[in-house]
């Protein structure tokens, strides 16, 4: 039995929320007992995208990719939230970004229970999905894996397993920062491979 999903795990998470209250990943405001930041709600709506889960064949950039989704444009407070998770020693921001992704993409809800939040798993939420697979993080040391933490929050919210070892880095690439869209596509081409299941 994993501690994370046990009664002990829930108690430890509650204790964590008492000592380190939830914060908005976008503006860093302490959220207290609210499930989402009221200050960022309007800003986030302007950055909202309509997710595309099934891609038309002619829009595939990655061979055999059946679907992809990005709930927000990478700008404004969303960009600040991602940068906070990546570069400001804020693993909690990665967790909260994952919760937000699950909320927007799958309709999961954050409910306040006791001293902190519990992401409510909605049965059948992820029908058609077997697992959540994070993109492998680069080798730069942060002390935690941002994509894996985000993916763990999504997996927990939709009730499917997290499989962090299914996709591995096949080769190193340049930093994506400062590259154009086309340069980014070339940079990640062949950078990852699927492991044997």
Give the positions of each predicted feature.
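Glycine-rich phosphate/pyrophosphate-handling loop used in enzymes and phosphotransfer proteins
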Residues: 1-197
């Amino acid at each position: 039995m994993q501690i994370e999903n046990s009664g002990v795990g829930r108690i430890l998470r509650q204790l964590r929320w008492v000592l380190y209250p939830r914060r908005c990943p976008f503006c860093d405001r302490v959220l207290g007992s609210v499930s989402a930041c009221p200050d960022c709600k309007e800003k986030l709506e302007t950055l909202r995208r309509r997710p595309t889960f099934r891609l038309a064949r002619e829009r595939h950039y990655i061979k055999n990719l059946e679907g992809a989704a990005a709930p927000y444009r990478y700008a404004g407070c969303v960009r600040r939230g991602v940068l906070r998770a990546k570069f400001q020693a804020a693993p909690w921001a990665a967790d909260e970004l994952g919760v937000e992704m699950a909320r927007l993409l799958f309709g999961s809800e954050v409910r306040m229970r006791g001293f902190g939040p519990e992401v409510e798993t909605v049965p059948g939420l992820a029908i058609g999905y077997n697992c959540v697979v994070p993109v492998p993080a680069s080798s730069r040391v942060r002390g935690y894996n941002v994509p894996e933490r985000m993916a763990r929050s999504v997996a927990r919210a939709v009730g499917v397993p997290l499989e962090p070892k299914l996709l591995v880095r096949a080769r190193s690439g340049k930093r994506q920062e400062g590259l154009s869209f086309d340069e980014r596509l070339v940079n990640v081409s062949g950078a990852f491979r699927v492991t044997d299941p």
